[in-house]
Regions:
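Non-catalytic protein-protein interaction scaffold segments in large eukaryotic complex-forming proteins
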Residues: 1-9
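Walker A/P-loop
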Residues: 152-175
């Protein structure tokens, strides 16, 4: 199974597995901070120590925010529903993209072909997954999106990768999440 499968993360029946996979991401990130940053001799050099300390503190803060996002998904039913909706929406979008590419080339197909295993056409039902940085970005922004009292509302997080790196999906994921969350919680 893919750890960050949009199909799996979009399944309300797979909450425990989804939470465990998200927690694994933050555990591995925490290990990376410890092993690659804190214990990196270059971070201890006097000419880099202040900058190194600042980088480590920002990484630890991001880790904290990601864990808070997971906690909210785990404990707040509306956050969980919004998270599954986000994944279902992104999965459907990726299915439609694959469908459009093939049908645009004159290949006979139907959208349902892209939402189930179809060995004849070389299609897997579980065809789309988040990259770790995308799901991490979503997790670290959840609290600031849903808690009107959160100090995180004063933070602006931007992604930068060259074209084709996956920024748009991460931003669209957050948009789908907050649309669903607001719909679920509006009076």
């Amino acid at each position: 199974e893919k750890a960050f499968s949009m199909l799996q993360l979009g399944s309300p029946k797979k909450k425990e597995v989804s939470i465990a996979n998200l927690r694994l991401l933050t555990a591995l990130y925490g290990d990376w901070i410890k092993n690659e940053l804190k214990e990196n001799p270059q971070m201890q050099e006097s000419s880099f120590q202040a900058t190194g300390k600042s980088i480590i503190e920002k990484c630890l803060d991001s880790l904290r925010r990601m864990n808070e996002g997971i906690d909210l998904i785990e404990k707040d039913e509306n956050a969980f529903k919004a998270f599954t909706f986000m994944n279902q929406s992104m999965y459907l979008q990726r299915s439609i993209t694959a469908y459009s590419k093939d049908c645009g080339r004159g290949i006979p197909c139907s959208l349902s072909d892209y939402m189930k295993d179809n060995k004849e056409k070389g299609i897997e039902q579980d065809h789309s997954e988040w990259r770790p940085f995308q799901i991490a970005f979503i997790l670290l922004n959840i609290k600031g999106l849903i808690d009107p009292e959160s100090d995180e509302r004063n933070i602006v997080d931007l992604l930068y990768f060259p074209t084709g790196g996956g920024k748009t999906e991460a931003y669209l994921g957050l948009i789908a999440f907050i649309i669903a969350y607001r719909r679920l919680t509006s009076d």
